[in-house]
Amino acid sequence: VGIFPPDIGGPATFVPKITNYFQDELNYEIEILTLSDSKNLNIKDDFSIKRINRDLPIIYRWLKTIFTIYRMGKNKDLIFVNGLGTETTIANIFLKKKVIRKIVGDPVWERAYNKGKTSESFDDFQVNNHGVAMSLQKKVRNFSIKNSDVIITPSQHLKNFILDLGFKNKIEAINNGVTIPKESAKIFSNNYLNITIVSRLVSHKNIEKIIEAISDLNNPLIKLNIIGEGPELNQLQSISLKSDFKNKIIFHGKLEKKDINTIFSKTDLYIQASNYEGLPHSLLEAMSYGIPVLCTPVGECREVLGNEDRGYFLNLPVSKDDIKSKIDEIINEKNIANKKSEEGKKFVSEKYNLTNTFILYKNLFTKLLEEEDK
C-alpha cells in the first residue's frame, strides 16, 4: 500500500524492485494499492495494481481508500505500507492483519515546511509546539505508527525518531540498496563540469539555491541537469530564465531509469542540498557510478560520506555561497574529488548493494509469515 510509479522519488523507485523480488524469487502473490493522477489511472502495469484517483474530493477519496484496503486485505497474510499509513491503520482495525510499515521521513514536517508553516529542522520540529492543528496531525501520525507490527527505516536516525515517538514493537533499520553498474561515470574527462540533481522539486530540497549558486559562478563550462517533477517546477524555471546561465540549465522532468543512468554516466558532480533526508536513493545511485557527491549532513548521509572521505558536505543552513565555494573547491582539486568518488563507490558497493537489501527483507518477511502460521 502506498506510493508507486509513475510517481517519483526513492520510495516509488524501491517498491517495484522489492515487488519483483518477492514475486520472482519467493513466489509471493502481491496486490498493490496506490494513488495516481487521473491521467495515469489506466496505464499498463506489470503488476496487479489498483489505482485510486488522488484528484477525488479528499473525504470521498479517503473513505474509498480505506474500504479498498479492507477489501484487498481480507485474503492477504501481510500488509506492507509505503504510504497511506493512516488509511491502512483504520482499515486494519477490522482486518487485524500484520502490518509492516516503511518510514522514510515525516510527512507532517515535510508538508509544513513545503507550505512555509515552519522553517525548523526535522529534529527541532518534533519537539517544539506548533499549535493545535499541527499537534493533531502529529497525534494522528503517532497513532498510525504505533499500530504497526513492524517498522522498517533506512537509517539509524529515523529509527531513533520512531523510538522517540514511543513505538514499542519491532523496528528494523534496513539500508536502501542500489544496483551497482558495471562501469563508472567518466568524470572530469574534459574541461566541462556536468552537474546533476535527481529530486522532487519541493522547497526543502533547496534547488533554488543550487541554481543561484551556479548562475553566480558564471562558468561557461558548467552544465546543470535537473531531473524530477514537483510543485516548485514553474518557480525554478522562472528563476533559471532570469539568469545569464539559462542555456546551461536543463529541466529534464521525470525520466525513465535508463535515461537517468545515461545522464549519470556523463555526470561529474551530484548535488543533494536538502534540509532533511532519511537516506536518499539517488545519492547512493550517483555514488555507485563513482560520481563525486556534494550533500548536506542530514539523516544517514553523514554515515555514507564519513568524515568527508567519500564526498563533500554542505553546511547547514544551506547557502548559495557555500555551494559556490564547494563547487570551486572540486573544480580546483579534481584529483582529490576523484579519490573521494572511488572510495564512495567502494563503500556503496559493499554496504548498500541491492542484493544484500533483498536478503534482509526476505529474512524479515519469512519470519513474519512463519509466525502467522503458528
Feature map (PLM): residue ranges:
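Nucleotide-activated donor-binding/catalytic signature segment of Leloir-type glycosyltransferases, i.e.
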Residues: 237-255
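Aromatic "clamp/platform" in nucleotide-sugar-dependent glycosyltransferases that forms part
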Residues: 275
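Acceptor-binding helix/loop patch of EC 2.4 sugar-transfer enzymes
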Residues: 100-139
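Membrane-proximal helix-turn-helix segments that form the acceptor-binding/catalytic region
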Residues: 66-74, 123-151
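Short hydrophobic beta-strand element within catalytic cores of glycosyltransferases
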Residues: 292-295
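Conserved acidic donor-binding segment of nucleotide-sugar-dependent glycosyltransferases
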Residues: 307-320, 329-334
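Short alpha-helical donor nucleotide-sugar binding micro-motif in glycosyltransferases
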Residues: 73, 145, 254-255, 262-267
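Conserved donor-binding/catalytic core segment of Leloir-type glycosyltransferases
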Residues: 152, 187-205, 210-214, 225
